[in-house]
């Protein structure tokens, strides 16, 4: 999108941290906001959307808005009964702050695309893997190569990323070419898409459990 190859994208926001380090704080992070409505307040009432748009504009992109996904879970080939049990484990993580936290507790972290996680677990290249929620991870076969799932504190599925956020981002030139009415329509539809996507993911996760 930045280079104009695509006009728009619907990514997981955390992966923008490679070119926009502050994007780490535009999605769920360790000890950050824990519920979808808290992120809505951040974006739409406390200036978060303006911050995101300023950061993305500097890279030639327009941040339309956040899209709620769901919590991440961690799959493991070995039992993890305390934070100390991550020490020495080879662990797939998305990088950035998340990886730094687990590195501090002794894990050997690596970044892998989703398509490479199953074979890495199967071959024993990694012991532990974070990806997304139960539905997607089940579909990718993680339950076939791991025996344990690491979850968060009571009431929260995820240990560190209870609200994984996606977004709608449009190249600045493509956004500028839209009429004011179409821009408003896209912004409104992003709200609707966020609600519908989040509900669909929660349903799929419940069925996967």
Task: Name each model-derived stretch.
Residues 2-39, 47-209:
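N-terminal secretory/targeting leader peptides
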């Amino acid at each position: 999108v930045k280079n104009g190859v695509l006009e728009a994208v619907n990514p997981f926001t955390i992966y923008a941290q490679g070119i926009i380090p502050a994007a780490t704080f535009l999605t769920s992070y360790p000890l950050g906001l824990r519920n979808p409505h808290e992120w809505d307040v951040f974006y739409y009432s406390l200036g978060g959307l303006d911050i995101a748009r300023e950061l993305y504009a500097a890279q030639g992109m327009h941040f339309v808005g956040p899209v709620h996904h769901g919590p991440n879970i961690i799959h493991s080939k070995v039992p993890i009964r305390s934070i100390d049990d991550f020490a020495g484990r080879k662990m797939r993580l998305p990088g950035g702050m998340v990886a730094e936290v687990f590195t501090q507790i002794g894990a050997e972290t690596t970044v892998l695309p989703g398509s490479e996680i199953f074979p890495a677990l199967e071959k024993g290249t990694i012991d532990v893997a974070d990806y997304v929620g139960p539905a997607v991870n089940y579909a990718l076969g993680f339950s076939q190569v791991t025996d344990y799932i690491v979850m968060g504190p009571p009431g929260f599925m995820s240990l560190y990323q209870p609200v994984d956020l996606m977004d709608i981002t449009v190249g600045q030139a493509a956004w500028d070419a839209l009429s004011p009415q179409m821009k408003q329509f896209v912004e409104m539809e992003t709200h609707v898409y966020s609600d519908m996507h989040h509900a669909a993911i929660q349903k799929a996760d419940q069925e996967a459990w």
